[in-house]
């Protein structure tokens, strides 16, 4: 025990332990300083984060406030030691133990003081940071209070709208906080002043119409103060810059839910590989800044009755003007908009976006991009109308509210029952497949008009000159109205020579033919010329009748009719329109139509008087003829028609409207008369080879003496001529018979056989009535036969002869066709051509045979007339003579004639068959000869080759 106590109390051991403690003190100090550095570094990091938040929250610090200046210069301790600067690396000062212990107090006391100083420095930095945060909060509250005071002051002074307020997202300096105009390649749009009703889908639908969108973001409010503002901002990033520029240009200043949009460029954002998909359909309320047009970006939304209850009550907003929907004047553009609306309702927003991407730059789809145009308003109304179940022809016409808070929508009126011509005029505004919208039609400049007039003055029938003038017209198709006006004026001048007029007509034909070219507004030429061609033909009619030379008149007639036929072949106009132009050109002067130049005031006074006098005389003659045959009734019926219907008929039939009601009625009567006359000419050409005993002079009836009806335009009830006009019934019956004879058309042989049986029944019935009907009908028929002015042939005899001839011709043609097919001919066109030639030959043979038999028939008719006269005298003396003898003699004569015709037809048929056999034999012999020659030629070649 004593030894141990000595060991513990040994002075050397105490000295060693003291030295050890001195060595441990610097180590302990270093460890404490490292702990202090570890404590300070998180606070420095946290302070940097708060400074960044201060920048984001737009906190401004007064640079003159030195009290808040942090201790960044470093502090010196009482003993002169310096503390390193904030944020710099700490390097502790190390002094050896002997130097550190020199001239100083007790070591334990100094260590405690240093530790206290370090603890005081640590708490001081934290306190400074907390105080700095408190001061920043006070500054923020003071700024918000000043802003509220300024708002109250402005509201007291002037009643400014919410659009005059500066958004909270602007700095006090006036610069948008998130705008970045430095990068010209950014596609990110910064949208300010959005309503609280707007969400991401709304922005995607609204801005998606301009192009594919990469991302949409709305900065939703977080604090109660931000929520009280009821508006916020957002970002819309497009996939390309061009779409963003278009959206910025079109949507700038647009009012959305009563908030005016302010759009600028934002910072560049990352673009994904694929754009956002199309959103589901919804509803929007957008209108332009003026408040006159409401704009829908969503096109396939459900009906308005599907809107939630909070928006179901549509209340009219005061001081908001009504929105009037105007239907586009261009029928083609209207049709495109209607079709687009129907397809968008089926395909949704994706279909509309696809059309907008492909149709960008196409004038036909400008209504999708011009949100303030009346075409876009019509498009939006069409979408809503179709969604409500309306159709293209019927819709709601009373005003209604489509969106809560907007004005009333006034739909366009329902289309009236308009004539097709009115539709043509409205469709005439369409030009070359492109919409002209509502811009006014262009006109030629003075130099262009003078150039075109010089071309027309020097125009001849040379192709180069006509081609040059036609090229000028197409190059200036935008001024089609003035070009047509100049051409029409030049074609209706009375002083123009015939070759020049014909050349100008050829120019009109070339322009109309090229109106389908892919030139803007070129198609307007056809529509505008359609309105002026009737007047041009009226002028050509005056020119045609004023020509004295027969050859010149015939050449003019041939040229004009060729042009009209070419138009008919090109299907440029309807057949009725072409027929009207042709009838106008060929109309004679005795139809009561005043000449074109007399109506326009171009004719001299003497000529006018002469024309008026001739017209009055012709009117008297035509009135007498009309009273005789019922034309006056038709004319009177037309005179009672309204003027609008007469104009419609004239436009449809290519007739001029000049001269008023009387002239239009006269032109319509002349047109119908010309159509009937053309029908007679066609029938005469078909029947002149079949009726050898009848010529045009025998069966011709004056066209002006026939009843006129307008069955082509409107079916009218027939006029009973016998009840209205005292005409003897036998003459009327004879006229009807002759008309029947004249209107025989070639039909099928099966129909002819049916007709034959019917006619035989009628014949037996008529013979029975003759036998039992009394004397009055017989004497009337005999009087008709005795009258040389009315040449009537027995109807049954003519019908039987005609049917027999046609039957034999058909049989011969069938046999001839079979013979051609047996010969190996397979070309159907060649067979038809030969059959047609053979038909003409057979008809010509029948005509010559009929002409040979004609004198015999005339002698028989004269004998029958003499016998009828003798029979009449004998009947006056002796009434007891029986009528069956007359019928028997008629039947005998008819049977004799039928036998003759039968034998003659049989002989002719046999003769034709012999001819065909001979021709066949000749052709076969020729073929054999050709074959023999070819074989001999081959043999010769072989022999030469062998040699």
Curated annotation (Swiss-Prot):
Signal peptide: none
Presence of keyword Zinc: no
Comp. bias regions, Basic and acidic residues: 1-11, 66-84, 104-155, 854-876, 888-916, 924-947
Lineage per the UniProt record: Eukaryota, Viridiplantae, Streptophyta, Embryophyta, Tracheophyta
UniProt-listed PROSITE patterns: CID, RRM, SURP
Residue spans of biased composition, Basic residues class: 12-34
CDD domains: cwf21_RRC1-like (cd21371)
SURP motif repeat start-end pairs: 336-379
Region (Disordered): 1-35, 63-167, 412-434, 752-797, 846-947
GO MF annotations in UniProt: RNA binding
GO term, biological process aspect, one: mRNA processing
Keywords: mRNA processing, mRNA splicing, RNA-binding
Domain SAP: 638-672
Alphabetical list of InterPro entries matching this protein: CID_dom, ENTH_VHS, mRNA_splic_Cwf21_dom, Nucleotide-bd_a/b_plait_sf, RBD_domain_sf, RRC1-like_cwf21, RRM_dom, SR-CTD_assoc_factor
Tissues expressing the protein: Expressed in leaves, inflorescence stems, roots, flower buds, open flowers and siliques.
A GO cellular component annotation in the UniProt record: nucleus
Knockout or disruption consequences: No photomorphogenic phenotype.
Domain CID: residue ranges: 444-589
Protein name: Protein RRC1-like
Gene3D superfamilies, per the entry: 1.25.40.90, 3.30.70.330, 6.10.140.420, Surp module (1.10.10.790)
Function: Probable SR-like splicing factor.
Top-level taxon of the source organism: Eukaryota
RRM domain boundaries: 187-268
SMART domains documented for this protein: cwf21 (SM01115), RPR (SM00582), RRM (SM00360), SWAP (SM00648)
UniProt key word RNA-binding: yes
């Amino acid at each position: 025990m004593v030894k141990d106590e000595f060991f513990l109390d040994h002075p050397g051991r105490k000295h060693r332990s003291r030295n050890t403690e001195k060595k441990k003190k610097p180590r302990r100090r270093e460890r404490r300083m490292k702990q202090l550095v570890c404590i300070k570094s998180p606070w420095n990091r946290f302070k940097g984060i708060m400074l960044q938040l201060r920048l984001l929250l737009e906190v401004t610090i007064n640079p003159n406030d030195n009290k808040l200046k942090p201790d960044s210069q470093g502090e010196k301790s009482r003993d002169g030691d310096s503390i390193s600067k904030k944020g710099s690396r700490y390097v502790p000062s190390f002094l050896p133990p002997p130097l550190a212990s020199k001239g100083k107090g007790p070591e334990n006391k100094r260590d405690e003081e240093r530790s206290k100083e370090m603890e005081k420095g640590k708490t001081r930095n934290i306190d400074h940071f907390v105080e700095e945060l408190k001061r920043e909060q006070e500054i923020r509250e003071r700024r918000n209070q000043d802003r509220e005071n300024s708002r109250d002051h402005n509201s007291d002074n002037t009643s400014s709208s919410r659009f005059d307020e500066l958004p909270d997202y602007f700095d006090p300096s006036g610069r948008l906080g998130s705008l970045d105009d430095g990068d010209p390649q950014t596609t990110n749009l910064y949208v300010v002043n959005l309503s609280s009703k707007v969400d991401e889908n709304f922005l995607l639908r609204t801005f998606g119409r301009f192009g594919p969108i990469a991302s949409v973001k709305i900065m939703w409010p977080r604090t109660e103060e931000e929520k009280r503002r009821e508006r916020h901002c957002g970002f819309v990033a497009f996939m390309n810059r061009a779409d963003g520029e278009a959206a910025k240009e079109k949507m700038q200043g647009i009012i959305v839910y009563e908030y005016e949009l302010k759009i600028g460029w934002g910072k560049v954002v990352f673009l994904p590989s694929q754009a956002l998909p199309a959103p589901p359909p919804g509803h929007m309320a957008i209108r332009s800044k003026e408040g006159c047009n409401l704009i829908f970006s969503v096109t396939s939304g459900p009906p308005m009755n599907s809107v939630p209850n909070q928006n179901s009550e549509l209340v009219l907003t005061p001081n908001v003007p009504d929105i009037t929907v105007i239907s586009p004047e261009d029928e083609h553009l209207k049709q495109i908009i209607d079709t687009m609306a129907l397809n968008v309702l089926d395909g949704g927003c994706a279909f509309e976006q696809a059309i907008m991407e492909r149709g960008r730059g196409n004038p036909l789809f400008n209504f999708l991009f011009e949100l303030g145009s009346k075409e876009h308003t019509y498009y939006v109304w069409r979408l809503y109308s179709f969604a409500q179940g309306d159709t293209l022809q019927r819709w709601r016409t009373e005003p209604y509210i489509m969106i809560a808070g907007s004005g009333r929508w006034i739909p366009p009126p329902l289309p009236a029952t308009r004539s097709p011509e009115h539709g043509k005029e409205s469709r005439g505004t369409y030009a070359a497949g492109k919409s002209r919208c509502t811009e006014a039609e262009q006109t030629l400049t003075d130099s262009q008009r003078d150039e075109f007039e010089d071309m027309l003055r020097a125009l001849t029938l040379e192709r180069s000159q006509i081609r040059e003038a036609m090229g000028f017209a197409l190059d200036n198709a935008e001024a089609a109205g003035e070009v047509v006006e100049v051409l029409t004026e030049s074609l209706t001048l009375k002083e123009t020579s015939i070759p020049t007029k014909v050349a100008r007509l050829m120019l009109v034909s070339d322009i109309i033919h090229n109106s389908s070219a892919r030139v803007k507004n070129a198609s307007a030429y056809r529509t505008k010329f359609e309105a002026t061609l009737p007047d041009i033909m009226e002028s050509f009619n005056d020119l045609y009748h004023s020509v004295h030379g027969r050859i010149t008149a015939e050449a003019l007639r041939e040229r004009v009719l060729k042009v009209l036929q070419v138009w008919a072949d090109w299907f440029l106009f309807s057949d009725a329109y072409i027929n009207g132009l042709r009838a106008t050109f060929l109309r004679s002067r005795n139809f009561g139509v005043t000449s074109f130049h007399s109506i326009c005031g171009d004719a001299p006074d003497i000529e006018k008087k002469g024309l008026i006098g001739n017209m009055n005389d012709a009117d008297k003659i035509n009135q007498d003829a009309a009273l005789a045959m019922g034309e006056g009734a038709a004319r009177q019926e037309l005179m009672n028609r309204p003027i609008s219907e007469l104009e419609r008929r004239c436009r449809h039939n290519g007739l001029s409207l000049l001269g008023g009601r009387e002239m239009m009625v006269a032109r319509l009567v002349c047109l119908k008369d010309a159509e009937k006359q053309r029908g007679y000419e066609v029938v005469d050409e078909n029947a002149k080879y079949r009726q050898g005993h009848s010529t045009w002079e025998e069966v011709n009836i004056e066209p002006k003496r026939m009843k006129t009806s307008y069955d082509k335009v409107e079916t009218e009830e027939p006029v009973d001529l016998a009840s209205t006009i005292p005409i003897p019934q036998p003459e009327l019956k004879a006229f009807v018979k002759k008309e029947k004879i004249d209107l025989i058309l070639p039909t099928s042989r099966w129909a002819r056989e049916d007709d034959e049986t019917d006619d035989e029944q009628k014949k037996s019935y008529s013979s029975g009535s003759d036998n039992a009907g009394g004397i009055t009908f017989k004497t009337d028929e005999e009087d008709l036969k005795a009258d040389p002015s009315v040449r009537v042939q027995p109807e049954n005899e003519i019908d039987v002869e005609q049917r027999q001839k046609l039957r034999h011709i058909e049989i011969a043609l069938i046999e001839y066709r079979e013979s051609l097919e047996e010969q190996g001919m397979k070309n159907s066109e060649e067979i038809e051509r030969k059959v047609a030639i053979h038909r003409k030959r057979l008809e010509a043979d029948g005509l010559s045979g009929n002409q040979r038999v004609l004198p015999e028939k005339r002698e028989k008719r004269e004998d029958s007339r003499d016998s009828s006269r003798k029979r009449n005298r004998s009947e006056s003396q002796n009434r007891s003579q029986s009528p069956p003898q007359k019928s028997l003699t008629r039947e005998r004569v008819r049977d004799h004639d039928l036998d003759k015709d039968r034998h003659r037809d049989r002989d002719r048929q046999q003769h034709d068959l012999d001819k065909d056999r001979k021709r066949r034999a000749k052709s076969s012999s020729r073929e054999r000869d050709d074959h023999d020659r070819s074989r001999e030629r081959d043999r010769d070649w072989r022999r030469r080759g062998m040699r």
